[in-house]
């Protein structure tokens, strides 16, 4: 069955809308976890390995201050706690990899722009990637290339880096990320020293 160009365009727009809506759902989920929302933290804690469950539940007592970033020029989420911060770009997909050159290369441009902006501040851009439709812990974390200064450099060294293609374009491979529960546990240990 042949569909018209108009119908094809409409279907494409609907898929884009659903992706945007779903993306914001997962962004709110991450914000709820990091900000210590009891319902979100308890739900997330059921998916993490037993050895990290206590660390995750500790977010209820010792949460991050989390805010959403406005507009498309900044990262999605900024999480602050004590003397550490995380500038986070949230990604979600049913695919286990995300190529930054997809969507007309806008992801690549955004990442490059953010990396340059954060370089002067001595911090780095972090990616939180949620794989849709998976049982268990669905969030993985990554760091964009940087040269951070101070205590935040320990966190940077702990996180796996974005992969790059031969053409130096970024991509995320979900299985190579560090589970969000490990990120939380490591932040707790960094701040207890």
Positions of PLM-derived features:
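Intrinsically disordered, low-complexity terminal regions enriched in charged/polar residues
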Residues: 136-193
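A short catalytic or substrate-binding loop motif that flags glycine-/basic-rich loops and adjacent residues
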Residues: 69-72, 120
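Nucleic-acid nuclease catalytic cores
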Residues: 115-149
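Active-site beta-strand-loop-beta-strand hairpin of nuclease catalytic cores
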Residues: 71-92
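Short amphipathic alpha-helical segments and helix-helix/interface helices
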Residues: 31, 111-118
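Acidic-basic catalytic patches of nuclease active cores, encompassing PD-(D/E)XK
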Residues: 1-69
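Mg2+/Mn2+-dependent nuclease catalytic core
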Residues: 93-114
């Amino acid at each position: 069955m042949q569909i018209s160009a108009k119908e094809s365009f409409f279907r494409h727009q609907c898929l884009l809308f659903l992706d945007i809506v779903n993306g914001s759902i997962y962004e709110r989920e991450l914000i709820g976890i990091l900000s210590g929302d009891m319902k979100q933290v308890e739900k997330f804690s059921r998916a993490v390995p037993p050895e990290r469950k206590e660390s995750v539940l500790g977010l209820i007592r010792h949460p991050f201050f989390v805010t959403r970033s406005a507009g498309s020029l900044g990262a999605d989420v900024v999480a602050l706690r004590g003397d550490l911060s995380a500038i986070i770009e949230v990604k979600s997909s049913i695919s286990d990899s995300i190529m930054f050159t997809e969507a007309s290369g806008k992801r690549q441009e955004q990442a490059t722009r953010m990396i340059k902006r954060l370089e002067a501040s001595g911090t780095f851009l972090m990616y939180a990637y949620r794989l849709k439709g998976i049982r268990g812990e669905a969030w993985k974390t990554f760091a964009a290339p940087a040269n951070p200064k101070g205590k935040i450099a320990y966190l940077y060294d702990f996180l796996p880096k974005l992969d790059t293609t031969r053409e130096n374009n970024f991509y995320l491979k979900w299985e190579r990320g560090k589970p969000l529960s490990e990120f939380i546990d490591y932040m707790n240990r960094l701040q207890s020293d």
